[in-house]
Regions:
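Acyltransferase
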Residues: 173-188
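Histidine-centered divalent metal-coordination motifs
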Residues: 79, 129, 169
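Extreme N-terminal starter segment of soluble prokaryotic enzymes
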Residues: 1-3
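Two-component/phosphorelay signaling modules centered on CheY-like receiver
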Residues: 16-25
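Cysteine-nucleophile active-site neighborhood
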Residues: 44-113, 117, 182-184
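Short hydrophobic/Thr-rich beta-strand motif most characteristic of the beta2 strand and flanking loop
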Residues: 25-31
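Catalytic beta-strand/loop cores that center a nucleophilic Ser/Cys/Thr
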Residues: 113-161
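Short amphipathic alpha-helix with an adjacent loop that forms part of the alpha/beta core around
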Residues: 35-43
Length: 188
């Protein structure tokens, strides 16, 4: 079973739809309607932390899920979920140099990552965000796996745990190869 933690965002159901085409065994629960014990009792195969408004501190249980469950379950953070991963491990989430809502942008590979396997360098991805993980504050345990031409972090991963984040939206029609990323994550 795949658990999607919903950060009160309409994109959650785009994720649900695309993931359901890969594996229909999905449960969606809002970020303030479950506990760590609930998640452990569910025993999900994967956890996906959805996009959402605001910043990681406003994302219900998400920071604690990352801090406490990162070694127990593979975790993928999308947009706000990605930012939560950066913050949970000690990075700073700051205002992006440019607010980007509904724009396709080129994303360049920066390091090998199992979730970016078979993705071409310079793939198109949908961006909807005004915050980013600050590159200068990235903790030693995380590495950048993709970035923009302006060096904004677009994907990261933990160096020893199965924890991955993408700032862009793989579930968007403006990310033509987004299904590949989700399929790669679900194969872990």
């Amino acid at each position: 079973m795949i658990l999607i933690i919903d950060n009160y965002d309409s994109f959650t159901f785009n994720l649900y739809q695309l993931i359901g085409e890969i594996n229909p065994d999905i449960k969606v629960v809002r970020n303030d309607k479950l506990t760590l014990e609930d998640i452990r009792a569910m025993q999900p195969d994967h956890i996906i932390i959805s996009p959402g408004p605001g910043n990681p501190k406003q994302a219900g249980i998400c920071l604690e899920v990352i801090r406490q469950l990162a070694g127990e379950f593979p975790i993928l953070g999308v947009c706000l979920g990605h930012q939560a991963i950066g913050e949970a491990f000690g990075g700073n989430v700051v205002h992006a140099p440019e607010i980007v809502h509904g724009k396709a942008d080129k994303v360049y590979l920066a390091a090998a990552s199992p979730i970016l396997k078979d993705m071409p360098d310079g793939f198109e991805a949908a961006r909807y965000h005004s915050l980013i993980v600050e590159p200068e504050s990235l903790p030693e345990c995380l590495e950048v796996t993709a970035k923009t031409a302006k060096n904004e972090i677009m994907a990261l991963q933990h160096k020893t745990l199965p924890v991955y984040g993408v700032q862009f939206h793989p579930e968007s029609i403006m990310t033509p190869q987004g299904r590949t990323i989700l399929k790669n994550f679900l194969s872990l």
